[in-house]
C-alpha cells in the first residue's frame, strides 16, 4: 500500500512539469507572430473609403455605380486585388448609405447602385483641390528641377560650343596668319628674285655698254720711202714776163 501511494503521489508532479513546458512553448509561439506583423509591408493603396469615393466620382454614371464597376475601377487604377477588398467595400457602402454620405439608387444593401450625396461632393472638392495643389506643387518643383538641369546642360553645351568656336576661330586665325606669313614670304622672295634679276640685267647692260679697251695692234712697221739725194727736185720753171713797152723803145 505504501509503495502504491508513493507512485500515485509522484505522478501528478511530472504532469505539472510537462504542462509548464507546454505553456512556455505556447508563449514563444504567440510571440513570433508579433514580429511578423511588425515586419509586414504597408499597403500600396489608399484606404477603401477614398478608393470607393474616387471610383464613384470618376465613373460619373447617372444611375449610380454598381459594386462590380467600383471593383473594376479600383483594381484598374490602384492595381490591387479587388476581390480581397470586396468585404471592406461592401461594409463601407452600407455604412456610407446609413450616414448619408452615399445615396443608393438601386437594390438593397451592397448589391445596388450608389451615388455621392451633395455633402459628400462638397467635402470631396476641397480634398481634391488640396490634392491637386500638392500635385501642382510637385509638378512645378519637378518642372523647375528639369528646367534647372536643362539650363545647366544648355549652359554647359553653350560653354562647350563657345570653347569649340573659340578654338576653331583661334585655329582659323592661326591658319590665316600662317597663310599671310607665307604670302609675305613669297612676296619677299619674289621681290628679292626680281631685285637679283634686275641687278643681273643691270650688270649685263653695264658690261655691254662699257667700251672695250682697244688692244694694241702689232702691225709690222712698213719701211718709209727714202728719197735719194741724187734725184733732183723738180723746180718750177718760171715763165718770162712779157716785156713792157718801155723796154721795146730802147
From Swiss-Prot:
Its main location: nucleus. Residues 27-42, 138-161, 192-234 have a biased composition (Low complexity). One of its GO terms (cellular component) is nucleosome. Residues 120-133, 174-191 have a biased composition (Basic and acidic residues). Residues 235-250 have a biased composition (Basic residues). Pfam families: Linker_histone. GO terms for biological process: chromosome condensation; negative regulation of DNA recombination; nucleosome assembly. CDD domains: H15. Residues 44-118 form the H15 domain. PROSITE patterns: H15 (PS51504). The keyword Nucleus applies. The keyword Thylakoid does not apply. Disulfide bonds: none annotated. Residues 17-53, 104-250 are annotated as: Disordered. It is found in: Nucleus; Chromosome. Keywords: Chromosome, DNA-binding, Nucleus. GO terms for molecular function: double-stranded DNA binding; nucleosomal DNA binding; structural constituent of chromatin. Belongs to the histone H1/H5 family. PANTHER family: H15 DOMAIN-CONTAINING PROTEIN-RELATED (PTHR11467:SF20), HISTONE H1 (PTHR11467). Histones H1 are necessary for the condensation of nucleosome chains into higher-order structures. This is Histone H1.3. It comes from Drosophila virilis (Fruit fly).
